[in-house]
Amino acid sequence: MTYFLGLTGGIATGKTTVSQMLAQQGIPIIDGDQVAHQVLANNQSVQAQIQATFGKQLVQDGQVDRAALGKLVFGNQAALAQLNAITAPVIRETIMTEMVQAKAHQVPLVVLDLPLLYEQHYETVCDGVLVVYLPVEKQLARLMARNQLSREDALKRINSQASLAEKRDRADFVIDNQGSLDQLKAQLKTVLEGVCHKSGMS
């Protein structure tokens, strides 16, 4: 049996750090961002739909101009919804195929690293969900420092995602990432013990 652990959080909460720690332990990661990049780079049907919807200039020599596309959809809910309608079904199909392969190979634990896990309803295909949490003021401070953003711009980015507190309340496992790296590692160890207990893995 394969246990699928969904991993999500908010921007600048430390989800990527947790994902890297899991990968270092040899746990396979299905990375939603990587899958999305592969779909944009390699799927000609998706590229054609992006050109038809947003303009021919967004695909040059078989490559999507991701920076231009990002600028176009950021802060524009209608454009973002159009892009998601084009890409989300293909991304989901790719992720589901990877999950089927993991099951076929009897991989005991696979992590689905998905920034929009709840927004796109992947919790329905996960056996458990881990949320990396920060109170919004700490999240804001980290994002402003990391990306050199104004408070207003950082808040816009945070508010473009679903409420982190809501995600935390829905999760099976929560890491509160306000402390040190060692504290983060200790919490992750506890989560993995909980996953082993729930899944029957030793």
Curated annotation (Swiss-Prot):
It comes from Latilactobacillus sakei subsp. sakei (strain 23K) (Lactobacillus sakei subsp. sakei). It catalyses: 3'-dephospho-CoA + ATP = ADP + CoA + H(+). It is found in: Cytoplasm. Pathway: Cofactor biosynthesis; coenzyme A biosynthesis; CoA from (R)-pantothenate: step 5/5. GO terms for cellular component: cytoplasm. GO terms for biological process: coenzyme A biosynthetic process. This is Dephospho-CoA kinase. GO terms for molecular function: ATP binding; dephospho-CoA kinase activity. The keyword ATP-binding applies. Catalyzes the phosphorylation of the 3'-hydroxyl group of dephosphocoenzyme A to form coenzyme A. Its EC number is 2.7.1.24. Keywords: ATP-binding, Coenzyme A biosynthesis, Cytoplasm, Kinase, Nucleotide-binding, Transferase. Belongs to the CoaE family. It is an enzyme of class 2 (transferase). SUPFAM superfamilies: P-loop containing nucleoside triphosphate hydrolases. The keyword Metal-binding does not apply. ATP binds at A12, T13, G14, K15, T16, T17. Residues 4-202 form the DPCK domain. It comes from the Bacteria.
